[in-house]
Amino acid sequence: MERFGLVGLPNAGKSSLYNALTGSNALAAPYPFATKDPNIGVAKVLDPRLDALAKMSESKKVVNATIEVVDIGGLVEGASKGEGLGNKFLANIREVDAIVFVLRAFVDDDIPGPSDPLEHLRVVELELALADLESVETKLGKMQKAARMDKSIADEVAALERAQKQLADGRPLYRAGISDADRELLAPHFLLTTRRVLAVVNVAENALDTIPAQVARVAAELAPPGSASEHEVEVLGMSVQIEAEEIGRAHV
């Protein structure tokens, strides 16, 4: 079963989205680090086509595919250097197969920090890239020395060198359009930014009409047309509060 990790700044709506997807009741509070240890649950992948087929075949039981959803504590600027939940937060991300960025696009006087999803995206991407850069540089020095005697690791070293160059610019690896060969070579190093990415722009309940514009802004930055990440990243918009009610009912 694949694991999807919900990642974002504090109070972006991660726990509310987790509850909606899994039918859980994890604490969702308007203060930082309400989630310290990750919440883990299972979500059904609802597919109308499956329901239609079941109806046609008169099946009594429909078995939906499932994914594991991990609600990871809020990331803050400086996490790669230990700020906030620091290394614990980053370690939790390393255990997932895909990352879901939850980006806040609503104003709430009780929640500190920016309400611009692009600012949320900037902080999250930079911290993940810096964490990967530190990991790559730590391993690369040792492996470059070893490669002088062991030519069998030359390709792996070259992949790490390419990754280092990209990360040093503060850009996640998924933006580079990682080749399948490099992805395989980098897999043993569990780099955060080699994972698949989905971005969810979370708008206010009374601002559904802003979704197309907000999604377009984030997509233009995260996966612009013609870029390496265009087909690597998907951007969705929603009001998590509304989805919590609608998706929650589907789990009843």
Regions found by a protein language model. Name each.
Residues 250-252:
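Conserved small/polar residues in nucleotide/adenosyl-binding loops
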Residues 60, 84-245:
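Conserved C-terminal guanine-recognition region of P-loop GTPase G domains, centered on the G4
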Residues 1-109, 125, 136, 143:
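Conserved G1/Walker A P-loop phosphate-binding module
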